[in-house]
């Protein structure tokens, strides 16, 4: 099989694998395994795209099923692994999350589906894979595959509109103002940009400090932010670097050293969801294992110590 044929499909395969697993590391492993199977001398392929999509989907289903126990024993909230790219979107990973169904909030919703529902929904609704092929991936009937996708669709639409709704065209403007206000310590502007029902959700698996439970409501989120400033210092938000997080404006930071009596802050990625011109969700990913798809990926191998969670 020609390498060029496979490389022409790599972006598509990464897009499928990432949506199925929610992690860049797993997606890369899956695409590599698909290449090894493609490169086998015994492999005869009539339709490379369909064949490779099926292989990637089956591997993704296996990953989801094997990950179920790990996620049950995970410390705190499990969030998808974000894809962080430059503002010019020239990073090859930017194309993997270019579509709206890969926005961070959309990936969070996918985490709430059963593995078979997720596969059926992603393949059919996301990539227009016929139900006959979806059924082949799942080892079930076409009718059962349709039912799985239907149930997944209902589960997705049943999620709060603030999370499952369409991306807000004012996203970049709102996030830019929020980050500037945070860096300047302008709490009045910060409050004005938060939706009354805003949530702050942390994910570190106990490896770095973050919220132990989701913080809900603008008043509580503002108090939480004030607590962060008291802990890490007034330069906390000035350390953020704007970037695209799953195709939408967000931020990341390599962390801060502990100086002048303030504590050191671990590296983290901030994904932000905007609806109706207001910030309705802040996602704080501080687990270094989830930095694979970001400029912080070198930090994965560096020990961070067991993090003490912020109380909320």
Curated annotation (Swiss-Prot):
The sigma-70 factor domain-2 mediates sequence-specific interaction with the -10 element in promoter DNA, and plays an important role in melting the double-stranded DNA and the formation of the transcription bubble. The sigma-70 factor domain-2 mediates interaction with the RNA polymerase subunits RpoB and RpoC. Signal peptide: none annotated. The keyword Transcription applies. This is ECF RNA polymerase sigma factor SigJ. Residues 131-150 bind DNA. Residues 107-155 are annotated as: Sigma-70 factor domain-4. The keyword Transcription applies. GO terms for molecular function: DNA binding; sigma factor activity. Induction: Undetectable expression in log phase, 18-fold induced by 30 days, decreasing slightly after (at protein level). Up-regulated 2.4-fold 7 days after infection of human macrophages. A motif (Polymerase core binding) lies at residues 29-32. It comes from Mycobacterium tuberculosis (strain ATCC 25618 / H37Rv). Keywords: DNA-binding, Sigma factor, Stress response, Transcription, Transcription regulation.
């Amino acid at each position: 099989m020609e390498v060029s044929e496979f490389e022409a499909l790599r972006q598509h395969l990464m897009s499928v694998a990432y949506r199925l697993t929610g992690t860049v590391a797993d997606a890369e492993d899956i695409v590599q395994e698909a290449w090894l199977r493609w490169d086998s001398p015994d492999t005869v392929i009539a339709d490379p795209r369909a064949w490779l999509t099926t292989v990637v989907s089956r591997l993704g289903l296996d990953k989801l099923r094997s990950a179920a126990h790990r996620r049950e024993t995970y410390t705190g909230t499990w969030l998808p692994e974000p894809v962080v790219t430059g503002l010019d979107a020239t990073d090859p990973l930017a194309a993997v999350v270019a579509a709206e169904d890969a926005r961070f909030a959309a990936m969070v919703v996918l985490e709430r589906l059963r593995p078979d529902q997720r596969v059926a929904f992603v393949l059919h609704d996301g990539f227009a894979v016929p139900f006959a092929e979806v059924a082949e991936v799942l080892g079930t009937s076409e009718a059962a595959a349709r039912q799985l996708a239907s149930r997944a669709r209902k589960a997705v639409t049943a999620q709060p509109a603030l999370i499952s709704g369409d991306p807000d065209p004012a996203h970049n403007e709102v996030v830019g103002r929020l980050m500037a206000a945070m860096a300047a310590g302008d709490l009045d502007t910060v409050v004005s940009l938060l939706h009354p029902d805003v949530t702050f959700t942390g994910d570190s698996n106990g490896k770095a400090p973050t919220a132990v439970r989701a913080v809900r409501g603008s008043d509580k989120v503002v108090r939480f932010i004030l607590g962060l400033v008291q802990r890490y210092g007034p330069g906390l938000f000035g350390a953020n670097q704007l970037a695209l997080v799953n195709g939408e404006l967000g931020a990341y930071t390599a962390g801060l050293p502990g100086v002048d009596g303030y504590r050191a802050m671990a590296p983290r990625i901030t994904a932000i969801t905007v609806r109706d011109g207001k910030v309705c969700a802040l996602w704080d990913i501080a687990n270094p294992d989830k930095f694979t798809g970001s400029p912080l990926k070198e930090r994965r191998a560096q020990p961070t110590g067991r993090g003490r969670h912020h109380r909320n």
